[in-house]
Amino acid sequence: MAPGMIMGGAAAKPDLNDVTYDAFLANDRTLGDPEVVKVEPGGRVLLRIINSSSMSAFHVDLGALDGELIAVDGFPVAPVVARRFLIAVAQRLDIRLALPRAPAAYPVLAVLEGESRQTGIILQAGGAPIARIPDTAAMASAALTLDLERRLRAVAPLEPRKADRRHTLNLTGNMVSYVWSLNNVAWTKDTPPLPIAKGERVELLFVNQTPMPHPMHLHGHEFQVVEINDERFSGAVRDTVLVPPGHRVVVAFDANNPGLWALHCHLLYHLDAGMFTTLRYV
């Protein structure tokens, strides 16, 4: 199935924000009264950006600053330099900044996916005056894509090895019934765990058959992104990967942490509606 297509071949128009909120916060504050972090002109700053929202993805906007992305979900990646970065629900970004020597105020903003509403903090270098930042950007942002994911390369990738087992997980559901599921099965306490065995290299193929993006999160393990839309590569090691509508993403992990572990969409309303399963091994 081609990217951006849903079952039956119809063109997909992503449904990006199915829950509306009154405000978006950065460290518990809006841009009406943002957190101001005092920094040194010419200094270096490490931003750790955590998308702890329940249902909202963002574009991180550094304005005039070049940011160096050095880790995702706590795992180092080869540096990627940009001024905007995409962050899905539950993902984390470590971004290193080298500030100019002149005093200035630098907004670090998060623009809601598909909309213009935004939040953020202010880096204040050398006591520079701070202008009020509007809570809407000049223009709406686009839907999140996998463009950044394709560029990421793990500093410490998994050892090369053939997979012992692969599970295909079709991401299923719709906005009408608001039942979200895996392989058309909404999880209950009677749903059996995915079968795997200790020591195996396991691949999970996520196929998004819905009009919404889903950030898929695995507990107890890190995985490596190894394939997007049938193109193999050695991507980032992380624990949450976005699967946009009509896309296919493969992740690989080693079964080296026995127990009962959750695997689910991190959009909390989707998790609660049934897009959840477990894996268990001893």
Segments (PLM) and residue ranges:
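Histidine- and aromatic-rich segments of cupredoxin/plastocyanin-like copper-binding domains
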Residues: A2-L146, E159-P160, N229-R232
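A Trp-anchored, charged/polar loop motif used as the substrate-binding/catalytic surface
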Residues: R29-L31, R151, W187
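A short glycine/threonine-centered beta-strand motif
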Residues: N51-S53, L152-A154, N208-T210
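Active-site pocket scaffolds in enzymes
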Residues: L69-R83, K162-V282
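Compositionally biased low-complexity segments at domain edges in trafficked proteins
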Residues: A137-R166, G173-M175
